[in-house]
Amino acid sequence: VLGGDGTILRAAELTHGTDVPLLGVNLGHVGFLAESEREDLHAAVARLAARDYTVEERTVVDVRVHLPDGGEPVRGWALNEATVEKAQRERMIEVVVGVDGRPVSSFGCDGVVTATATGSTAHAFSAGGPVMWPEVDAVLVVPLAAHALFARPLVVGPRSTVTVDVLPRSASSGVLTCDGRRRIDLPNGSRVEVRRSDTPLRLARLSTAPFTDRLVSKFSLPVVGWRERAADVSGRAAERSRATTREEE
């Protein structure tokens, strides 16, 4: 797949539920889901043709929406995240977040992100959620701009079910988006259930480097401590001093 993370997420709609592995070549900006950069395209194609790659399975979440009219649940899925957000910009949405059939917290907010480990570096990350390594089999719950004392991110076990209820008294109705693409309107009184899927998404991998390297590279993280920076500054100052001395001589 040639493109950025959005293009890769669109391609995932075609491969989800199949045994076909997905490999992304980054033509966008961050490209967290991509395995190769554009300058390495020819080498990536050669390795694919030679079947010189490994397959990594990524957790996907299944989503079920119960609407207040009592009809059949609407089903969906997400590789990155399923997000319940307010439908009206000027008003908050009031929700109850629950885990395994038990309410955990109720608050007004802009929304709630329910993410996989893969999605922890996307919308959930920008909302203050933690980064989870891809092999972590868990579901992340991150409130968006919640007006509450207890509205912290939650890391939920793989066998748990997360629910987000849009309260009947909510000033705004809601909208559910899966991976920022597939959208379902949520009238007041709707319930969204999110749980880990039994069908993971398969990604082709060319590199054996740990996820840590990808994290540092994609986010351009400063990995040199102050001691090393201080030593580097001192070294440059000493070099300038020696150069000045040579010029004076």
Question: Where is each model-derived feature located?
Answer:
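N-terminal glycine-/serine-/threonine-rich phosphate-binding loop
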Residues: 1-18, 42, 46
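Short glycine-rich anion-binding loops that position phosphate/pyrophosphate groups of nucleotides
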Residues: 4-7, 30, 118-120
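Proline-centered loop/turn at the N-terminus of a beta-strand
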Residues: 19-21, 140
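Catalytic core of DAGKc-family lipid kinases
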Residues: 29-111
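ATP/nucleoside-binding phosphotransfer catalytic cores, i.e., glycine-rich phosphate-binding loops
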Residues: 84, 100-103, 151-249
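Short aromatic-centered micro-motifs
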Residues: 97, 119, 176
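Gly/Ser/Thr-rich active-site loops/lids in small-molecule metabolic enzymes
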Residues: 102, 106-150
